[in-house]
Amino acid sequence: MTLREEVEIRKTFAIISHPDAGKTTLTEKLLLFGGAIREAGTVKGKKTGKFATSDWMEVEKQRGISVTSSVMQFDYDNFKINILDTPGHEDFSEDTYRTLMAVDSAVMVIDCAKGIEPQTLKLFKVCKMRGIPIFTFINKLDRVGKEPFELLEEIEKTLEIETYPMNWPIGMGQSFFGIIDRKTKTIEPFRDEENVLHLNEDYELQESHAITSDSAYEQAIEELMLVDEAGETFDKEKLMTGDLTPVFFGSALANFGVQNFLNAYVDHAPMPSGRKTESGEEISPFDESFSGFIFKIQANMNPQHRDRIAFMRIVSGAFERGMDIKMTRTDKKMKISRSTSFMADDTQTVNHAVSGDIIGLYDSGNFQIGDTLVGGNQKFQFEKLPQFTPEIFMKVSPKNVMKQKHFHKGIEQLVQEGAIQLYRTLHTNQIILGAVGQLQFEVFEHRMNNEYNVDVIMEPVGRKIARWIENEADIRDAMNSSRSILVEDRFENKVFLFENEFATRWFLDKFPEIKLYSLL
């Protein structure tokens, strides 16, 4: 198979949603259809003893939420699919954001009872900004929820994107009968999936069935006719630019409508795209020369070995285990002899991978998030990955001073994952951690105890706003202000931490010569 042929069968996407919309459950069912797993363990496994394949970290298993981004690959219908299950909790938006930089499309899961929720909106905006195709799966149709037209209107108005329903539900909740596939004019019954029913062009049922006298069926047919009369067509160009989302109805937990979605997804989702360098050059996925970038670092995927894995998205060319690659940031060459693919915590050695694939590289501390890796004598850097400005800051120290070595190793590794940000006060070298949300600190505390055997003390510093210094101004007078704390980030950039917006404005008025900026 040529490189082009290998690349063209790849599909790489992330699943995004608000917590509890059914994102991880949908991931499990997709893996089932891909033959990657034999039995789905749902995230509700904290009661049943089963755990979701994509939820591998101890804290995830206990809480039933996804707080890391899991990467899984499976084969389906002659395609190789790379699926990234992103953190659902809003506190982990920074990790999710970076993950969305490594995919070519996204699947948005919506709870039919709740519609568009805050986290869904936030993540959608990131996808929209990237201009990647977005597929929508409206979940939990076997429960009572909003009407289909209401949901479509909410998506269009709130997200400012056109919708095109690929199928249509018959009833919902207790009266949920199934879905009508608009393309094939078939009905897939919820309770009897094998017994597919057929409609003619006028939506008349070809088989004799009691459903024809059901009011939910009559309503669904009337609604579908209204949709058809509106005359909207499925515009693939609009899908590719992120201006139209195909909508699917189903129930991930009941494994219903999932294969209908998956079949359409592999038909319409894009193959791997290229990526721009800092100089604006577009690197094509079909370029023979290898290139890739690190978008995530995860420590302790195997706590027995205290290992670190750097997740790399391949942008161009082919990766071969044992090949020499160069890290652009350091201009150093390295031989990659340990490379892996994932099924959550189950890993397999990767000998060969191409554009669109995501592989793990064992990391002894060489890699940073955003690193560009290239083959041969290439010299370019991909566009930088964005970083979020933290909104909560905590002083942190070990309860047991004899555990300093473990404490600092834990801090170093967890900070390098990018889930939490590190700062140090200028004169006392006090460690301060910054996060987007409170849950990140809870997970940090749990992992320090569980993975590094260190109990930590965390104290709020009373600061909520971080601003980086943009110019080389004299900051000696500003350092003595009681309304701010001067710290350095892990790259030794100087940062002021403020109590609130008022304190920030006061500082800017008092010291106009100091120019400040914030991250995203």
Curated annotation (Swiss-Prot):
Pfam families associated with the record: EF-G_D2, GTP_EFTU, RF3_C
SUPFAM superfamilies: EF-G C-terminal domain-like, P-loop containing nucleoside triphosphate hydrolases, Translation proteins
Gene Ontology annotations for the cellular component aspect, listed alphabetically: cytosol
Predominant location: cytoplasm
Residues holding GTP: 17-24, 85-89, 139-142
GO molecular function, one term: translation release factor activity, codon nonspecific
Subcellular location: Cytoplasm
InterPro entries: EF-G-like_DII, EFG_III/V, G_TR_CS, P-loop_NTPase, PrfC, RF3_C, RF3_dom_3_sf, RF3_GTP-bd
Gene Ontology BP annotations: regulation of translational termination
Family named by the database record: Belongs to the TRAFAC class translation factor GTPase superfamily. Classic translation factor GTPase family. PrfC subfamily.
Entry protein name: Peptide chain release factor 3
